[in-house]
Amino acid sequence: MLDNQTKQVSLFPDANLQTKRIYEYDYSKNSDKVSVSLEFQNSEVNDLGMPLPAGRVRVFQNDTDGSQEFIGEDNIDHTPRDEKVRVTIGNAFDIAVERAQMDYRRITDRVSEQDIQVKLRNHKKETVTVVVVEHSWGDWEVTKSSLPVRKVNARQFEFDAQCNPDQEVVLTYTIRNK
């Protein structure tokens, strides 16, 4: 190597992973984009099953002619074997999203309600599920929703919106905060 030259060396050989593609919309992180992540198990089934050090993960997929195509990269934390790893590879350019507060009502000095609308347009050729992540404060309750709601913790809840090709899905919900 020459002076001041850097060389990248793979720590692990190429692994043929069984991955799950996750589309996620989180208004608090990116108000107008749907992120794309790949999730996999750090297991022997996936040619891994060993502690993974923190660092950059680069993701490639085979092109139509069999050559490798770079699709994204992310940094991961130290990951023990048999745990899930999630790598965010970028934003979906063919899924459009719009979020708006449609109404706000003050019920009492300590209670308010908001009507929220999230529009998702899928321009892909296949059906995808977009996880819509929402956050709230205080004592909250989703009182009405066009899709089933899933409480993640005291500050976060989610909806799974199935989006068919070239169609729009409109999620509406009412949240009451105390």
Predicted regions mapped to residue ranges:
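Long, intrinsically disordered, low-complexity accessory segments associated with secretion
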Residues: 1-178
